[in-house]
From Swiss-Prot:
InterPro entries: Ribosomal_uS7, Ribosomal_uS7_bac/org-type, Ribosomal_uS7_CS, Ribosomal_uS7_dom, Ribosomal_uS7_dom_sf
CC terms in the record's Gene Ontology section: small ribosomal subunit
UniProt-recorded Gene Ontology molecular function terms: rRNA binding; structural constituent of ribosome; tRNA binding
Free-text function comment from the UniProt entry: One of the primary rRNA binding proteins, it binds directly to 16S rRNA where it nucleates assembly of the head domain of the 30S subunit. Is located at the subunit interface close to the decoding center, probably blocks exit of the E-site tRNA.
UniProt similarity note: Belongs to the universal ribosomal protein uS7 family.
Name of the protein: Small ribosomal subunit protein uS7
Signal peptide segment: none
Database matches in CDD domains: uS7_Bacteria
NCBIfam families found in the cross-reference section: rpsG_bact
Subunit structure: Part of the 30S ribosomal subunit. Contacts proteins S9 and S11.
Length: 156
């Protein structure tokens, strides 16, 4: 590993419409090929769908969905004596947020609605109620960690 100083984290500016840093991060997660305006339109469209579908505040639904999808533990492979063990480790807060957003994006992509804003709105509403594909992924990761609890003494 290089012995240079640690590179400082970049400051992410809050998004222009809601003034929320998490929404800005999610825009960056959704963005493909540097097309930020397209990603913003998808998110703002999804927020409009949430407003019309449920009548709830879209920002509250978004924060609830992200909070519900955050994993507490995950498994990492560790090689000990010629065997690979899946060792459960606690997830750092920054990674929790990143995984949560990534799983929401992937679950929304797999849905069958016609447009991406509709798919994202549906997934966010379901995740806010602890249902949906992203929640299924989080529960699967938690189950894996629970099943491999016996190897937790192989700490990193």
């Amino acid at each position: 590993m290089p012995r240079r100083r640690e590179v400082p984290k970049r400051e992410i500016l809050p998004d222009p419409k809601f003034g929320n840093v998490d929404v800005a991060k999610f825009v960056n997660v959704l963005m493909l090929s540097g097309k930020k305006s397209v990603a913003e339109n998808i998110i703002y469209g999804a927020f409009e769908h949430i407003q019309t579908k449920s009548g709830k505040d879209p920002l509250e639904v978004f924060t609830a969905a992200i909070a519900n999808c955050k994993p507490l533990v995950e498994v990492k492979s560790r090689r000990v004596g010629g065997a690979n063990y899946q060792v459960p480790v606690e997830v750092r807060p920054v990674r929790r947020m990143a995984l949560s957003m990534r799983w929401l994006r992937e679950a929304a992509n797999k849905r069958s609605e016609k447009s991406m804003p509709q798919r994202l709105a549906g997934e966010l509403l379901e995740a806010a109620e602890s249902r949906g594909g992203a929640m299924k992924k989080r529960d699967e990761v938690h189950r894996m960690a629970e099943a491999n609890k016996a190897f937790s003494h192989f700490r990193f």
